[in-house]
Amino acid sequence: MSCSEKRGGGYKGELKERNHHVLEGEEDEEEEEKTSSVTQPNSSLTAPQLTIDGNLLVDPKLLFIGSKIGEGAHGKVYQGRYGDRIVAIKVLHRGSTTEERASLENRFIREVNMMSRVKHENLVKFFGACKDPLMVIVTELLPGMSLRKYLVGIRPNQLDLRVALNFSIDIARAMECLHANGIIHRDLKPDNLLLTANQKSVKLADFGLAREESVTEMMTAETGTYRWMAPELYSTVTLRQGEKKHYNNKVDVYSFGIVLWELLTNRMPFEGMSNLQAAYAAAFKQERPSLPEDISPDLAFIIQSCWVEDPNMRPSFSQIIRMLNAFLFTLPPPSPSVLESDTNEPAATSNGTITEFSARARGKFAFLRQLFTAKRTKNSQ
């Protein structure tokens, strides 16, 4: 678990009053980016009662909220302090009806339980949570910014290819960890990816839409962001309230393909389209963002494998990591100035070493391509 200290207590009156005031703010300005949330009728009566392990609860008396640093459809994020730690504090909305409150509370408990059981260097660290009088999640505060903000800030320039690949490997490793623990994120996009202080690594945040994979792989269609969502998440027909839908963890692989394309091009997916137009183009016309003419065939293959229509044809994140690393080793060595500024990246000391790595990488990459090509051929017969 990310947090093993046992904590408890109640909010100070001043903090409680302030937090309640916080929740009365304006609605999410990016709601247009989202699909409608589906709440099952009588969910509070039919859903099993979820609980949070007492070891995961923070002591509210040690929790102080500062300035707002982010906002989403389900809550707001603040910079704050927990004891002597500078932290990020996510305050979630309670809901206005009994059914909505029950649904949001279950979502909150699931998010807390999932965050507490996965630990990885590319996942935002979870410190704890409290449920009353407000639903709060406490995590590490990254001094960097979201990947979305960073990419917008450097436009019209693009990321250095090595930087883009290292970011993508960070993301793939985080997703590999989630999938290994039976968790589907369902909302992988640059807004939920945060840069570290030195802007050399990326961490995945926001488990608000994450779900545990069930044996039947039947889940309720919920909120997500169209431009990065796998088509099977919003299907060819609108789901009626409470209907179930089949999908698996390969929805995250599709989203990763879009994010990888974005890292390489620094453009908005489905540029020039509205959100609904983007959804229609992806689901009904099988359209995908245009690949650059000068993109490496190997990188094009990785991206196209991720966003292929048939989820079963998409690679796993373990395979994606192998392919990205293999391609990374085929690149020429970085310039001396890059090596001096990046102490995290090992420098090769001889051309022979680089050549040896490149040869191995090309062989491994060729094998993976043959594997996926054979799988596609077999599937189409």
Model-identified regions with their sequence ranges:
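Short beta-strand micro-motifs within the conserved protein kinase catalytic domain, predominantly
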Residues: 125-133
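Glycine-rich ATP phosphate-binding loop
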Residues: 78-96
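Activation segment signature within eukaryotic-like protein kinase domains
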Residues: 167-168
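A conserved loop-to-beta-strand element in the N-lobe of protein kinase catalytic cores
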Residues: 132-140, 148-149
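Regulatory alphaC helix of protein kinase catalytic domains
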Residues: 108, 112-113
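Protein kinase glycine-rich loop
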Residues: 66-77
